[in-house]
Regions:
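Residues that define the transmembrane beta-barrel architecture of outer-membrane proteins
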Residues: 39-41, 62-68, 84, 128-134, ...
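Predominantly the C-terminal beta-signal and adjacent terminal strand-loop region
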Residues: 32, 38, 180-237
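Transmembrane beta-strands of outer-membrane beta-barrel pores
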Residues: 47-53, 90-98, 140-142, 157-165, ...
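Residues on the lipid-exposed face of transmembrane beta-strands in outer-membrane beta-barrel proteins
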Residues: 70-76, 90-92, 132-140, 155-159, ...
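Short glycine/proline- and aromatic-enriched beta-strand/turn motifs that initiate or cap beta-hairpins
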Residues: 18-75, 235-237
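Short loop/turn motifs that connect adjacent beta-strands in outer-membrane beta-barrel proteins
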Residues: 29-41, 77-84, 143-151
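Extracellular/periplasm-exposed beta-strand and loop segments of Gram-negative cell-envelope proteins
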Residues: 56-63, 98-108, 112-129, 162-172, ...
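Glycine- and aromatic-enriched membrane insertion/assembly motifs of diderm outer-membrane
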Residues: 42, 51-52, 59-117
Length: 237
């Protein structure tokens, strides 16, 4: 009986070893080890030039308006070749807009909006916002497990929240800073599109809802302002 038990154990040892072996998702080509379950473009950062569209009469941009964005997108391939994927993520951005809309408040702590004309002498009027972002992309790429250089076309939507806003006016003997504006739409919703090859990728984002739900104090014009961002995005890993 002991001999039969010993033979049974010896026969099954190789099978037990195979069961405990980790699954290898890599393919060896020559001396190169290739990951067949690769993911792409999970960390990103980029720079944008910011425009304000749907401006009422009299509002114009001045100086440089730009932004910085960075974040993480979890890549989930949805086909066997891994050239199609969906990617939800979490990001952060800062955006600055130079323009001639003065944001101030009256004695009752109510917001007021004035369009600055050429008769107003000021050196700076700009608002800056800081956002937490939730992007979601549908991705196509010409990637393979062997190559890091490929074409990509990504389209998606993004929800963002402005957790800090600052409007800063600097004029002759008068500086005004506003951080609490009730008419500000802190929740932002927009569509985005990215395309490019290898390192350089063009990025576009358009906000579907206006920045302010308010009218100008003096002329009673709807402010609106829909940000459009145009820039470059870079991906890592």
């Amino acid at each position: 009986k002991n001999t039969l038990l010993l033979l049974f154990i010896l026969i099954n040892l190789p099978l037990l070893g195979q069961e405990n072996q980790p699954v290898n998702d890599s393919i060896v080509v020559g001396e190169t080890k290739i990951d067949s379950l690769y993911r792409e473009d999970q960390f990103y950062f980029g720079f944008t030039f910011n425009l304000l569209l749907n401006r009422p009469e009299g509002i114009r941009q001045s100086g440089f308006s730009g932004g910085l964005q960075l974040g993480y997108l979890r890549d989930f391939p949805i086909n066997k070749k891994r050239t199609l994927a969906i990617a939800p993520g979490l990001g952060w951005s800062i955006n600055s807009y130079g323009q001639n809309l003065l944001v101030t408040e009256n004695k009752n702590d109510e917001s007021e909006f004035y369009i600055l004309d050429n008769e107003n002498d000021y050196s700076r009027n700009r608002f800056t916002n800081y956002l937490v972002e939730l992007p979601l992309e549908l991705r196509w790429r010409s990637s393979t497990p062997e190559s890091y250089k490929f074409w990509r076309i990504y389209a998606g939507v993004k929800a963002s929240y402005i957790y800090h806003f600052k409007s800063r006016y600097e004029g002759e003997g008068n500086n005004v800073t506003q951080t609490k504006v009730e008419e500000l739409n802190r929740w932002r919703y927009g569509v985005m599109f990215t395309f490019g090859y290898n390192t350089f990728n063009f990025h576009f984002y358009y906000s579907l809802n206006p920045l302010f739900d308010a009218n100008t104090t003096e002329y009673n014009r709807e402010i609106g302002l829909h940000p459009l961002k145009i820039g470059l995005t870079f991906y890592i890993l």
